[in-house]
Swiss-Prot record:
Subunit description: PSII is composed of 1 copy each of membrane proteins PsbA, PsbB, PsbC, PsbD, PsbE, PsbF, PsbH, PsbI, PsbJ, PsbK, PsbL, PsbM, PsbT, PsbX, PsbY, PsbZ, Psb30/Ycf12, at least 3 peripheral proteins of the oxygen-evolving complex and a large number of cofactors. It forms dimeric complexes.
Similarity remark: Belongs to the PsbM family.
Topology class, membrane: Single-pass membrane protein
Function: One of the components of the core complex of photosystem II (PSII). PSII is a light-driven water:plastoquinone oxidoreductase that uses light energy to abstract electrons from H(2)O, generating O(2) and a proton gradient subsequently used for ATP formation. It consists of a core antenna complex that captures photons, and an electron transfer chain that converts photonic excitation into a charge separation. This subunit is found at the monomer-monomer interface.
The organism of origin for this protein: Huperzia lucidula
Protein name: Photosystem II reaction center protein M
Length: 34
């Protein structure tokens, strides 16, 4: 079974980018509350 590297990278970026973005927003709001 051949793994499509480009599809794997695209899926990883599609998941990691929104997760990292929301995590950064959470850290910023948490630091502002403190």
């Amino acid at each position: 079974m051949e793994v499509n590297i480009l599809a794997f990278i695209a899926t990883a970026l599609f998941i990691l980018i929104p997760t990292a973005f929301s995590l950064i927003l959470y850290v910023q709001t948490a630091s502002q509350n403190n």
